[in-house]
UniProtKB/Swiss-Prot annotation:
Homodimer. Probably interacts with PlsY. GO terms for biological process: fatty acid biosynthetic process; phospholipid biosynthetic process. Belongs to the PlsX family. Pfam families: FA_synthesis. It is found in: Cytoplasm. This is Phosphate acyltransferase. Keywords: Cytoplasm, Lipid biosynthesis, Lipid metabolism, Phospholipid biosynthesis, Phospholipid metabolism, Transferase. It is an enzyme of class 2 (transferase). The keyword Cytoplasm applies. Its EC number is 2.3.1.274. Pathway: Lipid metabolism; phospholipid metabolism. The keyword Disulfide bond does not apply.
Length: 346
């Protein structure tokens, strides 16, 4: 089960991608194909001990930059590292893709090359957030900045199926992110979506606020990609800032340093819970394949974990199970959606 890594995507490519791949291959025995400029990748690999590791290189002459249009991965730069990585999955030379590059391009290439699961209009990027009660799945966190109610309803259905059959939540609670809990709150998009979700037969809790993501009030939080990406970046920035503040306070006096010795383990556990690198990346749910989208500034640990999680998804047949469930349950849910939409409109 080989994982194709877009080695040219990300802020620190290819050094971080190559080292992350080497560590993943060494720790987990995962076969990996690095996709990108052969000469540059060979130079990076030469810095590491790769003896006995199954790491191959597949040349790609182009790179989709962070500021390039997402469509470049499909139309103009057909030999880009991200496009070629998905081509390897399509041809059976790899089973999953990991990329820290342009997320829009990754999504576009995934949809164009691997296609979408049956009934899905738009795949979504799903991110797991740590909470007081465990985990909360938030989608979309950046794939679709402009959405219609049908898209948010599909995100809710995908999130419900994913939480139940992948994360293992027996009866996922679904919430729609808004600026208040009252039905009168929100905008036109959320109000119409809220009215429809209330009449679909799963555990829909209604509107939730940003704070509810972290208190574990619901298991799945639905929002458009613009709002979701703001939530994601805000969370990352807050965690980083809190960490810096704590380190400054600890270093401010001898008493603080002594006190830290007694709570050091607790701080380390807290840091691990809020470190995005622990989760590696976010799965792109809704395409006919496995893809992990990583933060552009991912470090070696994040790339390593993203490769590991992608490999585990393939090994456990997660996408096949999800596709089967989506085909049966999604169809039933969408039949309800059509009926409810007509009733709401009427």
């Amino acid at each position: 089960m080989r994982v194709a890594v877009d080695a040219m995507g990300g802020d620190n490519a290819p050094a971080v991608e190559v080292e992350g791949a080497v560590v993943a291959a060494r720790e987990f025995g995962i076969p990996i194909t690095l996709v990108g400029d052969t000469e540059k990748l060979r130079l990076e690999l030469a810095k590491h001990n790769v003896q006995g590791l199954d790491i191959a290189i597949h040349h790609a002459s182009e790179v989709v930059g962070m500021h390039d249009a997402a469509s470049d991965a499909v139309r103009r730069k057909k030999d880009s590292s991200i496009r070629v990585a998905f081509d390897l999955v399509k041809s059976g030379e790899a089973e999953a893709v990991v990329s820290a590059g342009n997320s829009g391009a990754t999504m576009a290439a995934g949809m164009f090359v691997l296609k979408r699961l049956k009934g899905i209009d738009r795949p979504a990027i799903a991110q797991i957030f740590p909470t007081l009660r465990g985990k909360t799945l938030v989608l979309d966190v950046g794939g679709n900045v402009d959405c219609k109610p049908i898209h948010l309803v599909q995100f809710a259905i995908m999130g419900e199926v994913y939480a139940r059959h992948v994360i293992g939540v027996e009866q996922p609670r679904i919430g729609l992110l808004s600026n208040g809990e009252e039905d009168s709150k929100g905008n036109e998009l959320t109000r119409e979506t809220n009215a429809i979700l209330k009449n679909i037969s799963f555990d829909y809790e209604g509107y939730v606020e940003g704070r509810d993501i972290f208190n574990g009030m619901v298991d799945v939080v639905v929002c458009d990609g613009f709002v979701g990406n703001v939530v994601l970046k805000l969370s990352e920035g807050l965690a980083e800032t809190v960490g810096k503040m704590l380190r400054e306070e600890i270093a401010s006096s001898l008493l603080s340093k002594l006190g830290y010795l007694f709570v050091r383990k607790a701080f380390k556990n807290f840091k691990k819970k809020v470190d995005y690198a622990e989760y590696g990346g976010a799965p792109l749910i809704g395409i006919n394949g496995v893809a992990m989208i990583c933060h552009g500034g991912s470090n070696v640990k994040a790339i390593k974990n993203a490769i590991h999680f992608a490999h585990e998804y393939v090994r456990k047949g997660v996408n096949q199970r999800l596709a089967e469930k989506m085909e049966t349950e999604f169809t039933a849910y969408m039949q309800q959606f059509d009926a409810v939409k007509e009733a709401v409109a009427g």
